[in-house]
Amino acid sequence: YSAQNSDTMIIVSVNNDTKEVRMVSVYRDTLLNVGDDTYTKANAAYALGGPEQAITMLNTNLDLDISDYATADFSALVEVIDDLGGLDIPLSYAEIEHMNNYCVETSKLTGKDYTPLEKPEPKPEDQEAIVGTYHLNGVQATSYCRIRYTASLDMGRTERQRRVLGMLFDKAKIAGLSSIFKIMDDVFPMVTTSLSKQDILGLIPTLIG
């Protein structure tokens, strides 16, 4: 693993009996015991000891029993989104502006291209109001997930991340197994996980319903 703070933490619960998938975000700036009674921002646990340390932190502080993990970088998310044909997402003027800014760095980090979205004119009085639905490619949708400077701050940021993951699950449900297998082949090398490919294959019926 890379000795850097984690950007995002999402706890995912998969119920194989009810076919239900639930997601809960942990704010990365939450003050938690990250180990040895050291209290600091939760995202530091990953830098201190990788995914295992992050899991220990969550289990210790939140009384959970997490045993498995998957970590991925921006490149993996971009790849999945592009493999599924992009996402149609309603955006506000503020989100378009911030997303375009993040796209510059996301494109450099992943080596993938994008086209900046044109901001509507004139600038609306309420910049947080939805101005339209836009088709986003991997770089754009990943940059959308990174936005944290709108009025909703980190709460809005984590909500966007869960929204994108939910939309990806929905698209995967209608993509077909051949597309899902292609995504696995493309993305698995970019992911560090405690799960084997066989484990993930066993989750597919639940994840795609």
Regions picked out by a protein language model, each given a short descriptive name:
Residues 1, 40-48, 63-68, 131, ...:
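Second-shell loop/turn segments in exported
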Residues 1-19, 202-207:
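Entry/capping segment at the start of metal-dependent catalytic domains
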Residues 2, 82-179:
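Flexible, polar/acidic helix-loop-strand segments at domain edges
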Residues 4-9, 18-26, 37-39, 53, ...:
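Extracytoplasmic
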Residues 14-17, 26-31, 47, 74-77, ...:
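Solvent-exposed coil/turn segments that connect beta secondary-structure elements
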Residues 34, 38, 136, 174, ...:
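C-terminal solvent-exposed extensions
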Residues 40, 44, 52, 56-60, ...:
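Solvent-exposed, polar/charged alpha-helical surfaces in well-ordered, non-transmembrane soluble domains
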Residues 79, 89-90, 192-197:
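Secretory-pathway/luminal and periplasmic proteins that interact with or process carbohydrate-rich
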